[in-house]
Structures are given as C-alpha cells and as structure tokens.
C-alpha cells in the first residue's frame, strides 16, 4: 500500500510517498532527496586551480535546493559550518526554515573536541543529523578510538537529540563500520552509506549494503564509471551523472528501504571530472545536478 504522508522535521514540513508494508509483512522505510555541498564540489572550490572568485555559500546552496524543488540540504566538510559565526549560523538556520528546507550537517576529523563543537552547531541550528568522516589530515583513529569517542558523546547527543552518522570513507571496511555502531549500541549512532567510497577498499556495493544497510541513517548517492586512463594504460574511476553509470541505483534504494531500521535521507553527491575551463566545469556541474535530481526523483 502506498500513501502520501506529511511530517515535520525541525520545523520543516515534508510530503512524500511512503510504502507502508509489502507482502509478507516487510516494512519499507521512507527516504527523501537532498542536495549536498558535494553536489557542487567545484562551485565550492575543491579544485586547486579551477576555483571561482566567489565560492558557493550555504544560502546559495539552499537556493539551489529551492530551484530544484528538493527539501533537504547537507553541508559537508567542503562547506564547514564551524567557519561561520553564531549570527551567521542563526541566519542560515532561519533562512532554511523560512523556505521549507531541512538541514543536515557534516564534518571530518572526529577528535572529541571537534565532535563536541559540531554537535553544538547542529543543536543550535536545529539540525537532526551530523554526518561524520572520522579521519583528517594526519589523523586516523583506530576502531577502538572511534568507538570510545562516540560512546563518550552519548550523553551530549541524548541531551540535544542529534543523530550521528559515520560515513564509510576510504580506509576502513564496511564490516568495521558496522562493528563500531554495534559496539556503541545507541539508537542515535548509525552509518552514512556511501555508494562509491568503499571502492577504495575493493568492496562492492553489495558488500557495503550487507554490513551497513541495517544501520543506515543517510545514503550518499554518487554514480560512477570505469574507463581507460588518458594514457591508455590502466583504468580510472570517474563520476557519472546519476543513472548513467555503473551503480544499480534502483536496486540499491530498494535494498536500503527494506533493510534500514529507520527513515533516511538520500543525498546526491558528485565525482564529476573537471572540464577544460572553469566556466565549462561549472556549467556541466549545474547540468549534472539538474539531470541527477530529475532521475532520482523518478525513483522515489
């Protein structure tokens, strides 16, 4: 049975389809589409030489979501909210709420001090989800250290209501991320399932889903292609507009909705290669965002 439901999160009313139950009593979770500062990595200044004179701001990212009729925005570490004053954070929060946009936060380098600061920011901005990349420059905590830091943060997240989502990101395997969450064993600590990052540990999306889907609090969707390198020797993994690459997106979304224990956001990211000029890069980035949003909307 499929119904339309309305619900409110952090003052934002969202309407979307929900499949309540399948034959055999399988519960299917809700998901909703979000944009990220990594939907627009070049506009946010990720490239060392192709950098706009003015980088995209949080308000401009919210405006992009409005233009594309997307109700959720996730700020990642390429748009770090700890670089803004309290007054600026309040303005971003109020602007998003006034325009019906739910916000999610993101950080990397999970030291105890940085985690505490980002939980504070999330609480101040009425943000329900903090996505976390544990590692940073020169900082690679062990599984035991990650587990300890998260466990120590439990009183704070219980007080604020913020959910922590640890993202699979390059170094650890999907099984290790699942182990961390199971050891912490708290309903406000889960996983951000990234569709592509675990290629760095030679894990397929099927392996990632097997371990991580039950703990999913957010899905990072980025499609990819594999092609010959420019020299013709070796292979390169590159980004693809959603629905045109190798990621079996409909099957992944279906699996997550059946196996996640809670509702989750589906946040669009991009690994697009840069073009010959900044102008061409930004134009293609914009086109990919529009086409990817249209494709993913057709699946939700």
Regions found by a protein language model. Give the residues of each.
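Hydrophobic faces of well-ordered beta-strands that scaffold small-molecule active sites
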Residues: 31-37, 73-75, 103-107, 130-132, ...
């Amino acid at each position: 049975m499929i119904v339309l439901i309305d619900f409110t999160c952090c003052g934002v009313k969202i309407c979307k389809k929900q499949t309540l139950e399948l034959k055999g009593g399988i519960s299917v979770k809700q998901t909703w589409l979000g944009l990220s500062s990594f939907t627009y990595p070049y506009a946010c200044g990720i490239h060392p030489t192709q950098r706009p004179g003015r980088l995209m701001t949080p308000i401009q990212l919210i405006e992009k979501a409005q233009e594309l009729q997307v109700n959720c925005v996730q700020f990642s570490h390429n748009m770090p909210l700890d670089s803004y004053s309290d007054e600026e954070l309040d303005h971003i929060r109020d602007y998003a709420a006034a325009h019906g946009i739910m916000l999610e936060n993101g950080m990397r380098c999970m030291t105890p001090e940085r985690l505490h600061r980002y939980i504070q920011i999330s609480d101040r901005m009425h943000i329900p989800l903090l996505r976390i990349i544990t590692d940073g420059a020169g900082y690679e905590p062990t599984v035991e250290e990650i587990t300890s830091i998260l466990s120590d943060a439990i009183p704070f997240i219980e007080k604020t209501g913020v959910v922590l989502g640890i993202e699979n990101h390059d170094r650890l395997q999907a099984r290790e991320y699942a182990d961390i969450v199971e050891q912490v064993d708290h309903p406000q600590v889960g996983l951000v399932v990234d569709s592509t990052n675990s290629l760095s540990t030679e894990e397929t999306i099927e392996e990632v889903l097997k371990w991580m889907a039950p703990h999913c609090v957010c899905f990072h969707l980025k499609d990819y292609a594999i092609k010959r390198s420019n020299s013709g020797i070796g292979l390169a993994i590159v980004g693809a507009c959603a629905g045109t690459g190798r990621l079996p997106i409909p099957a992944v979304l279906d699996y997550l909705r059946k196996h996640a224990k809670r509702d989750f956001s589906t946040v669009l990211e991009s690994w697009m290669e840069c073009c010959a000029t900044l102008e061409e890069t930004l134009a293609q980035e914009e086109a990919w965002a529009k086409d990817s949003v249209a494709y993913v909307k057709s699946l939700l």
